[in-house]
C-alpha cells in the first residue's frame, strides 16, 4: 500500500509499502540533545538518534564542496552543470568512493572535530576515538544500499560502537537517504545468527578458502557481502517493524548502533547522493584493528581471519 501523502519510494528496485503500519519518519531527538541520560535511553529503545541541524549547515556545505570539486575534476559529474549540483555523468556507476576522504581537511574537520566529537564524548561519557577509515558514499542514480547491520563488517573490537551517517547536502526522498528498520537492534533472532558473523572470516579447514579470501579481488574475497537480505520489502514483512527515514538536510546527523539494520532508498534523481559513514567508540575500549592506522587494512588480505567451520 502507498501513503497518498508520499511519493513512490523504492529500495533495491522494489516499491516500499508506505502505509502507516509499514513506514514512518525518524524520531527527532534534538529536544533532548543536552540530556545524555535520555539520549542513551532513546538509543537503547530506538537503536538510533536523529539530530536534525545538529552539525551546522555551513560546515557541512564546506565539506560537500571539497567532495564535489574532486568529483568534477575526475570527470564524474556532468560538465553542463555546476560541480556543486553533483549531477551524475552518464554511466558513472558511482557507489562507494573512499578516496574522496583522503587528505580532505574540510571533511575531517566536520567528522572528527567540533560538534561531532563533542556529541560522542557526552553520549559515551568519556574520551572518544574514531576509526581512521572514512566510508564515503557517492551514489549515482540507481539502487541504494542493501539491508545490513554494521557489526558484521567491524565486530572485532568493542560492540559499544556507533555509526554517524552524515548527509553532505540536502537529500530528499527522490535522492534517497538512509532508512532504519524499526526495532531491529533488539531482535534476538538476528543477534543469535546474522549479527554474529564476520565478512572477513573464512573456513580454514576447507581447501582453497584461505587462498580465495586473501587473493581473489572480486568482492574483497568474500563469499558473502554482509547483507541480511536483498529484499527490503520481504525483510520488513518477516521481521515486522517499519522502515523509518526522513528528508534530510545538510547539518543533520543520524547515529545508530552496530546492531541496527539499515538500508537506503534508491536514488531516483539525476544527481549523486553524497554522504559519509564514520565510527566512534570510547578510547579505552578495544578497537577493530582493520580500521585504524594511516593505511587501514580494511577488508584486504591482512584483515582476513580463519575459523573452523
Walk through the language-model features, giving the residues of each.
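Non-heme Fe(II)/2-oxoglutarate
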Residues: 1-29, 62, 77-82, 193-199, ...
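Short, solvent-exposed loop/turn segments at secondary-structure junctions
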Residues: 55-57, 136-138, 171, 185-186, ...
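Catalytic core of non-heme Fe(II) oxygenases with the double-stranded beta-helix
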Residues: 118, 145-245, 285-294
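Short, charged/polar surface micro-motifs in flexible loops or helix N-caps
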Residues: 126, 139-142, 171-173, 253, ...
Amino acid at each position: 500500500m502507498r501513503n497518498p501523502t508520499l511519493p513512490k519510494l523504492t529500495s533495491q528496485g522494489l516499491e516500499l509499502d508506505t502505509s502507516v503500519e509499514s513506514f514512518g519518519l525518524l524520531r527527532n531527538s534534538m529536544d533532548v540533545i543536552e540530556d545524555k541520560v535520555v539520549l542513551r535511553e532513546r538509543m537503547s529503545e530506538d537503536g538510533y538518534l536523529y539530530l536534525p541541524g545538529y552539525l551546522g549547515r555551513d560546515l557541512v556545505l564546506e565539506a560537500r564542496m571539497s567532495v564535489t570539486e574532486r568529483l568534477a575534476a575526475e570527470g564524474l559529474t556532468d560538465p553542463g552543470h555546476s560541480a556543486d549540483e553533483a549531477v551524475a555523468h552518464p554511466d558513472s556507476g558511482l557507489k562507494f568512493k573512499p578516496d574522496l576522504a583522503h587528505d580532505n581537511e574540510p571533511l575531517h574537520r566536520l567528522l572528527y572535530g567540533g560538534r561531532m566529537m563533542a556529541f560522542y564524548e557526552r553520549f559515551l561519557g568519556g574520551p572518544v576515538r574514531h576509526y581512521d577509515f572514512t566510508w564515503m558514499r557517492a551514489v549515482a542514480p540507481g539502487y541504494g544500499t542493501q539491508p545490513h547491520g554494521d557489526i558484521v563488517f567491524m565486530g572485532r573490537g568493542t560492540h559499544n560502537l556507533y555509526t554517524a551517517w552524515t548527509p553532505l547536502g540536502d537529500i530528499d526522498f527522490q535522492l534517497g537517504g538512509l532508512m532504519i528498520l524499526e526495532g531491529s537492534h533488539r531482535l534476538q533472532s538476528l543477534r543469535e545468527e546474522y549479527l554474529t558473523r564476520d565478512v572477513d572470516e573464512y573456513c580454514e579447514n576447507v581447501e582453497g578458502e584461505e587462498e580465495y579470501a586473501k587473493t581473489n579481488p572480486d568482492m574483497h574475497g568474500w563469499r558473502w557481502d554482509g547483507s541480511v537480505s536483498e529484499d527490503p520489502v520481504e525483510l520488513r514483512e518477516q521481521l515486522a517493524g517499519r522502515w523509518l527515514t526522513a528528508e534530510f538536510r545538510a547539518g543533520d546527523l543520524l547515529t545508530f548502533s552496530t546492531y541496527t539494520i539499515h538500508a537506503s532508498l534508491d536514488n531516483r534523481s539525476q544527481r549523486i547522493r553524497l554522504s559519509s559513514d564514520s565510527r566512534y567508540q570510547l578510547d579505552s575500549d578495544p578497537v577493530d584493528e582493520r580500521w585504524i592506522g594511516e593505511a587501514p587494512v580494511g577488508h584486504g588480505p591482512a584483515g582476513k581471519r580463519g575459523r573452523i567451520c
